Amino acid sequence: MSLRQFIATRALLKTLSAIKNSILYSWEEAARILGLDEDLYTHPLHRELDRPVRVILIGAGNRGGIYADYATKSPREMRVVGVAEPNGARRRRIAAAHGIPPERCFTDWKQVFEGGPPWADAVIIATPDRLHTAPCLRALELGYDVLLEKPAAPTEAECRQILAAAQASGRIVGVCHVLRYTPYFRELKALIDGGMIGQVISVQHMEPIEHVHMSHSYVRGHWRKSEDTTPIILAKSCHDTDILRWLVGAPAAEVHCYGNLKWFKQANAPEGSTPRCTDGCKVEPECPYSALQIYYRDRKRLYVFDLPADASKWGPLILQGLQTTDYGRCVYRMDNDQPDHLTANILFSNGVTAGFSMEAFVSYEGRRTRIMGSMGDIVGDMESFTLTSFKDGKRRSWSMKTDAHGGGDHRMVKDWVQAVGQRNPALLSSPIEVSVESHLIAYAAEKSRVNRTIETVQM
Ligand SMILES: NC(=O)c1ccc[n+]([C@@H]2O[C@H](COP(=O)([O-])OP(=O)(O)OC[C@H]3O[C@@H](n4cnc5c(N)ncnc54)[C@H](O)[C@@H]3O)[C@@H](O)[C@H]2O)c1
């Protein structure tokens, strides 16, 4: 869709919404009624590429798999031509899905770069948090463009090092701040920038992790110890410091943060509980974090077990996983240290203040955001929002149902592929140059939390 068609379509949909006596269609519904492409959020600079961008996937876990899927969906834009992944099942799955020859399949990221000059256009780095900096620096040195998972790096020094290397090499480094690419946040940003609520005065933003998700990733899972990964404000919430910086439209000046681990610890282990849920735990039937319930009976979050395609074989394999991996351990008897609740206050250089809460103990997911402006306010939950104007008291609503990441994952990959294919970084909303700032807010917040200080943020 061209920019002109895009603007005309939106105007038409808005009229349609208004006519309906303020019973508003979602964009998605309206697009369906009008028989239009549902994806109204395509970047106006997108164009057909001369050839697909050739990428090497480094880290073929959960995120890497999602990004690689884009090549299956859009083979004219992206091809996965190599993979580096120590886990054999994951490596073979990607190789089979993308027809990668054995000589382009590796067990470690370093092997990708041993052959000397680049044999692809770009690399996607979706390795664990502590394994981003080294492959990114090496890729830039050899002349690859990069799509880098967030957090870009565990420390401020490494983050600045990546920025310097990207600038020196002139290569494109996109950071996976997927929220920026969601229709929901794009619409919010457009309304704010269009002055629909006057000047932004303050923001309240909450990230509800959801209690089982918390237990899976930050109590039992890879991200449970900040030393081994990154502090949770980076691992989970650098998306939020990023979205706040983006919506407010000014750099952060100061940050203050409180937060601690209050519930998921030994002192709260119920009487009768056992080291593993499969050890005959007496409270297992009523425990909200029962691994038997989550993984075995409800069959949720099973990607961590690398199960075969044939679901009839899963039962015994899941039970074996619960007896041998961290995912079967009692949530009160882990070696976790990530805070399960945290609040940060941010003062931006334009005087806007933002309050951010990261909460584990909630039954829902989906960021909640309230934006207070001089001429109106916005209240939203990532599926819908309502804008109320102080001028005429009118309320305007927007809604769209999408996947867990608000539909941002593949929209982000598309923008990055287009940026690489067209050699135009302007197509990317989250290049490293911008992303460093959001990371600096998170590093400062963690410093404040640990040292009980108010931290200055300096670019
Ligand atoms: N953008 C987002 O919204 C988002 C969401 C979740 C996670 N993440 C981030 O994405 C990254 C990956 O997370 P994930 O959930 O996919 O984790 P994961 O554990 O599923 O995947 C990481 C993969 O890297 C592989 N790996 C480890 N060492 C390697 C090496 N030396 N060479 C090559 N591969 C190696 C692992 O075997 C694993 O398969 C993390 O940094 C995480 O914080 C981002």
Indicate where each model-derived feature is located.
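N-terminal Rossmann-like dinucleotide-binding module
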Residues: 3-100
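Beta-strand-loop-alpha-helix segment that lines the small-molecule cofactor/substrate pocket
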Residues: 122, 128-129, 133-180, 195
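Predominantly a Rossmann-like dinucleotide-binding segment in NAD(P)-dependent oxidoreductases
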Residues: 179-329, 452
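Conserved SAM-binding strand-loop segment of SAM-dependent methyltransferases
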Residues: 102-108
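Glycine-rich, N-terminal phosphate-binding loop of Rossmann-like dinucleotide-binding domains
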Residues: 126-127, 207
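C-terminal capping/lid region of NAD(P)-dependent oxidoreductase domains
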Residues: 16-19, 23-26, 30, 171, ...
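C-terminal helical cap and adjacent loop that interface with cofactors, partners, or active-site loops
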Residues: 33-40, 98, 338-459
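Short amphipathic alpha-helix with an adjacent loop that forms part of the alpha/beta core around
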Residues: 109-119
